[in-house]
Amino acid sequence: MYGDPTAIRRLAAGLREQAGEIRGEADRLVARTDAAGWLGRGGDALRDRARERALDLRRAATLHDDAAEALERHAHEVDRLQRLIEEIEGRAGRLLDVARDRLDDWVSGWLDAFHPPPRGSVRWLEVEVPRW
């Protein structure tokens, strides 16, 4: 198939976990520099720089969360399309079974010429089959 929703969701979970780790690292960076006890302009500069880096880390964590959300949406869409393909395959199969059982020989030749796409193929989305 064109994507494994379970694997995609696993990647999304990994990104969310990394986002949490990055946020934790940002918090630890600020806490360590605040706890250093360095006074004066040098200490102030260190703390300012650490807060800037922590902000950058939090932005990176947010981007990880955004990527994870995009992967979740993609996994949902893959699930939806796989169900749609399965439904179309089933309808086409039922139609072919009914048609072969009930139609004259001349139509059977036409039916024999229909070559369904492979199971799970995205080409099933192009097949038009009436609902039964």
Which residues does each predicted region cover?
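N-terminal secretion-targeting helices of virulence/extracellular proteins
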Residues: 1-132
